[in-house]
Amino acid sequence: MKKKAFFINAVILTLSSLVGRFLYMGFRVWFSQLIGPEGMGAYQLILSVFLPAVAISTAGVSLTVTRLVTSAMGKKQPETIPSAVARCFGFSLLMSLTACVVLWLGADSLSEKFLGGNSAQALRMLVPGLPFMALSACMRGYFLAVRGVIRSAVSEFAEQLATISLTVAAFWLLSPKTVADACLYSMLGATVGEGVSCGCSFLLYRLHVRRYRSAQNRPCTGAGKAILHITLPSTLSHAARSVLSAAENLLIPLGLRKCGATASAALAQYGMLQGMVMPLLFFPSCFLGAFASLLIPEMSESLAAGKNRSIASVTGRSLRLTLLFSVFTACFFVAFGREIGVLFYRQEEAGELLRLLAPLVPLLYLDMVTDGLLKGLDQQLRSLAYNTLDASLRVALMAGILPLMGLKGYFCILYSCGILNVTLSLSRLLKTAGIRFRVMEWVVLPLLGAGVCIGGWSMLPVPSVSQPLGLILAVTCTGGGYLLYVSGIKAVLQKRKGLFSRHSLTKAI
């Protein structure tokens, strides 16, 4: 593995992801304050119904392009790369146009049965963005394979900037009077943003792929097989999982109503959970998202070259770093969740929900990185099977438990299914990579360090985290102390390993 190139790409992706997350969170906060929790609930339900169409259009194609391009470069056959990408373009366009037709024709029925109100227009507004999303997914896989992450970052930044700018302009000029109008203008911004991103990606792709074009360009003979082996199963599995996820999201407000909440209160609770708390919970994952995506081509190359020791080493380090980061993040949300909710949304209830869901962070982040590692090791079908099982179980439990227990039942379902999914995925990864899980080093010691740093800070007479300065100080100081602790623990563990290594024992004898 080219460590320097990997590190540079990781830094570029992390910084771009961080900027994008800040823009997205700022937009979310502004949008939620305009339409309120109930409006956010309606907005999230529309997106939930739209996600299966996105899965049909994009699932698996990015991974297929990455695998085909890295394989061509590994076999010293770069002249087949343009043909491979073109075939993936064709497949993704076919799937996305099919999804467009189905969603456009079914928008009225879906709105009437599941969404309520005048949601069909907002749902149809998202349809033209599907082909753009499909093509962008192909080019994202290409950029990942050639380590051109800055090109992917530029395209994503252009998308977010266009989406936010157009949505804000539409709100300012047209002043939506209803939640349906607000959702419609937001979906218009999202569709235009996808078009801008696709155009930007295509321009950068054309400029870069020219180096692989020559008079001896040959068709990629393995493209059709790769589409059948990777893209098609992934598309079908992701589509099934997205349908289950949509069903899960539709069942949440329905179950809360059956438990005694009014329709308005149930939609508001759902909007606060999915539209306000969950984005905060996933916000720090931008530091891991770039890392997880870069692992796919690196692990694919190691697998193709038979570098088993490299696979084991990278897997162990990835899991350790993920848990170090996620344990600290979870502890921070538990300690300061209420204040963070007040700072971002001016609502203590959102902060309290953030505290209750904070222990999920290690499970969510570990699942993200484990999924990337499994895909790189050609275990994507296993990963999809586990995710589909998880989604099916959630839907069944939502239908049975939520009407009886309300939000408490929802939390129980999230934790139990999260533990099951991570256990299955992690067990498969450990077996494939040939390593064992180090509970003391990866979980217990980080938990102890995070507890000491964050607990100590919370007892000091410092500005409240509900103020911007207080949050910055808390993150900087507790994070710095935690890094020092982690560095010290690493040095001690390395010294112990050195003392008890085979070379040291032989020398002593």
Tell where the protein language model's regions lie, with residue ranges:
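N-terminal membrane topogenesis motif
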Residues: M1-L23, E79, S83, R218-R241, ...
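Signature of the first transmembrane helix
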Residues: A5-L63, C100, W104, G129-L130, ...
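Alpha-helical transmembrane segments of multi-pass membrane transport and lipid-handling proteins
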Residues: L18, A86-K113, A312-L363, V395-A396
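Short runs within selected transmembrane alpha-helices of multi-pass transporters and secretion channels
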Residues: G20, A59-T66, M125-L144, S152-Q160, ...
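Helix-terminus/linker motif at the lipid-water interface of multi-pass membrane proteins
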Residues: F22-M40, S111-E112, L173-L174, A239-P284, ...
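Helix-loop junctions and terminal segments of transmembrane helices
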Residues: A59-G74, L281-A305
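Hydrophobic transmembrane helix module of multi-pass membrane transport proteins
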Residues: L97-A239, V243
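Transmembrane alpha-helical segments of multi-pass transport proteins
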Residues: A182, S237-H238, V243, V439-K495, ...
